UniProtKB/Swiss-Prot annotation:
A Pfam match: RRM_1
KW Lyase (keyword) present: no
Domain of life: Eukaryota
GO molecular function: mRNA binding
Region described as Disordered: spans on this chain: 165-203
Name of protein: 31 kDa ribonucleoprotein, chloroplastic
Tissue distribution of the protein: Expressed at high levels in the leaves and seedlings, and lower levels are seen in the stems and roots.
Subcellular location: Plastid, Chloroplast
Length: 292
């Protein structure tokens, strides 16, 4: 077993000539380490002759980036990754497919210290799903990043950035912007609004609706819509929030325009990893109408 000691800290990326070795939904984590305490113990049997370690220059002089690999997971010895409050997490949507975790980290470090970056990938195709999550060090940096990068253009796309936890409730809100000035970015947080949805009191057909459970607290209507749009035309996407606290209850509903899209979504998305959780997708049971 070969051991490599790093004296001057830089970004380190372990790369392989085999693209399939990369783990989809890999998380890029940043954390401080003393310059003398980092040791990478790499098993020659798990890496092979094709692996290499390349320095990556960054303004972070005392931070280390480690990308998660299937075959290196047990061979890289580092400090345990700390947990961060959901208040420090940002959702980043409408990303170009070429943007990976390293590129996203390089952008958001302009607003402060980046702790964790995750771009969400499709397990089968390995392609980016066009959205991800960024965790900053402080709430002030979260606000700065949201103000600085919401609407920021990358490769011709204006990215969407908003904080993970639910903001204060607003009446009659919807993502698409109810006319008359009552719109809010995330939408659906007061139980009377929806992402793409029915405006002016029109009801949404619930016959083609799926239930989505075990959602991370940082997933909102926008993230849900971004994910499920890959399987068809999303008529409505809504995360259910607690009326008192305003926080996500960890589940939501997505409505499609056809039964085929519902079946495709269940087959393709049930059990996939979204922001560190294996989501549950099933046909939603229509609740019986109240009798008065």
């Amino acid at each position: 077993m070969a051991s490599s000691s790093v004296s001057s800290l830089q970004f380190l990326f372990v790369t392989s000539q085999t693209p399939s070795s990369l783990k989809p939904n890999s998380t890029l984590s940043f954390f401080s380490l003393p310059s003398s305490s980092l040791n990478l113990s790499l098993s020659s049997s798990s890496i092979g002759h094709s692996a290499s370690i390349k320095p990556f220059e960054s303004s972070f002089s005392t931070r280390v980036a480690l990308s998660d690999f299937d075959q290196l997971e047990d061979d890289v010895e580092v400090a345990e990754q700390p947990r961060f409050s959901e208040d420090l997490k940002l959702f980043v949507g409408n990303l170009p497919f070429s943007v990976d975790s390293a590129a996203l980290a390089g952008l958001f470090e302009r607003a402060g210290n980046v702790e964790i970056v995750e771009v969400i990938y499709d397990k089968l195709s390995g392609r980016s799903r066009g959205f991800g999550f960024v965790t900053m060090s402080t709430k002030e940096e979260v606000e700065a990043a949201e103000q600085q990068f919401n609407g920021y253009e990358i490769d011709g796309r204006a990215i969407r950035v908003n904080a993970g936890p639910a903001p204060a409730k607003r009446e009659n809100s919807s993502f698409g912007g109810g006319r008359g000035g009552n719109s809010s970015y995330g939408g659906g947080r007061d139980g009377n609004s929806s992402f793409g949805g029915a405006r002016g009191g029109r009801s949404v057909d619930s016959s083609n609706r799926v239930y989505v459970g075990n959602l991370s607290w940082g997933v909102d209507d926008l993230a849900l819509k971004e994910l499920f749009s890959e399987q068809g035309n999303v008529v409505d996407a809504k995360v259910v929030y607690d009326r008192d606290s305003g926080r996500s209850r960890g589940f939501g509903f997505v409505t499609y325009s056809s039964a085929k899209e519902v079946n495709d979504a269940i087959d393709s998305l049930n059990g996939i990893d979204l922001d560190g959780r294996s989501i549950r997708v099933s046909a939603a049971e229509e609740r019986p109408r109240r009798q008065f």
